[in-house]
Design a protein with these regions (language model features):
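PLP-dependent amino-acid enzyme catalytic core
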Residues: 1-261, 270, 276-348
Length: 348
């Protein structure tokens, strides 16, 4: 039956939860429960999650994003819950989350292709999407767009110290691990769930041809925020800074060094050692990058100030949220306790 409330369970590492909560707040027939890792997101991010009323509530879990994701995934396979409640997800484990995201890959790549001859005087360049990545849902949306015909030649997976996918691309060994806290906290994912989708869509050899991968530690993130501002005047957040630095390095010598035979140490921040099929287009200066920026820098004011020497301006809508009371609910990293809470609080 499709009668009754649809309960959305969503794990967030910082940004997904507030977007989902805002989209579904006060929507009749929908109920939203957001799980986020306590103490591992910025103050503004937490305020965006913990101040909802009505049909949206936030559980702050004593654990990591991977723990939050595990609780949500386990709930979806729990027969007791499935019999009593209509459950769905707004995470990328739900394909309905990925399909709309694929549209902006399609749109942006078509706009660039149609404008490039006017703006850059390049002749049919390769279009590369540079994607700050944690759980790899966003990048997987780009892969879907490419398979639907978007004129994208390749992707750069830009990650922080949680470099499970870059290490896989470098070695062929997929080794999920506990996540590590970084300045780019929305990407603090040690076991990306979309690895399974990527592996289902492409062979490992195809992945190495399609992807470059680039990672930074915290010091590199701060330097990149400052470098981006110095070179472009743009104030960028920690996640976008990794994407910006990845493209800046790739098109200014790093890819050319790989093509010429230099071996990269993938244990050090930077580019993984595989050479994608579009590498020569980089060397020949016949490639254009589309860098995805994922968050407002004001959500990471202390980090940006430390990097640039000044705080980013906080938009009024974020400043207003900071004045609202915290309504988050503490939750242990224990599935039985989480299940008990759901059974007691969800409405049929």
């Amino acid at each position: 039956s499709e009668d009754g409330t649809l309960h959305i369970l969503v794990a967030t590492s910082g940004d997904t939860g507030s977007a989902v909560g805002s989209a579904f707040h006060n929507v009749p027939g929908l109920d939203v429960t957001i799980l986020y890792p306590e103490g591992k997101i910025s103050e503004i991010q937490e305020k965006q999650l913990s101040t909802f009323t009505g049909n949206v509530r936030a559980l702050k879990v004593k654990g990591t994003f991977d723990d939050c994701q595990r609780l949500v995934k386990t709930a979806f396979t729990d027969e007791d819950l499935r019999k009593q409640f209509r459950l769905s997800s707004a995470n990328s484990i739900n394909i309905s989350r990925l399909l709309p995201q694929s549209f902006y890959y399609m749109y942006s790549s078509l706009v660039v292709r149609n404008r490039i001859a006017i703006d850059s005087k390049l002749d049919n360049p390769s279009i590369i999407s540079i994607v700050p990545s944690g759980n790899f849902g966003n990048l997987t949306s780009g892969l879907i767009a490419k398979e639907m015909g978007a004129p994208i030649a390749g992707f750069v997976a830009a990650t922080n110290t949680n470099r499970t996918i870059p290490d896989w691309i470098a070695t062929g060994n997929y080794n999920p691990r506990p996540s590590v806290e970084t300045y780019a906290n929305a990407m603090d994912v040690g076991a990306p769930s979309n690895y399974e989708r990527i592996k289902a869509m492409y062979s490992f050899e195809q992945v190495k041809e399609l992807f470059a991968s680039y990672w930074l530690d915290n010091d590199g993130i701060k330097r990149s925020i400052a470098e981006c501002n110095d070179k472009t005047g743009y104030v960028i957040d920690p996640h976008g800074a990794i994407g910006w630095k990845a493209w800046d390095a790739i098109r200014n010598g790093d890819m050319e060094k790989l093509v010429s035979g230099q071996k990269n140490d993938f244990e050090q921040p930077g580019l993984t050692p595989n050479i994608p099929c579009w590498a020569n287009d980089i060397v020949n200066k016949n490639a254009v990058g589309i860098i995805l920026e994922t968050a407002h820098p004001a959500k990471f004011g202390d980090i940006v100030k430390d990097a640039m020497g000044r705080e980013p301006i906080i938009p009024s809508r974020l400043a207003e949220i900071m004045e609202l009371p915290d309504r988050s609910i503490p939750m242990e990293n224990d599935y039985d306790l989480f299940k008990d809470w759901l059974m007691a609080n969800l409405q049929k």
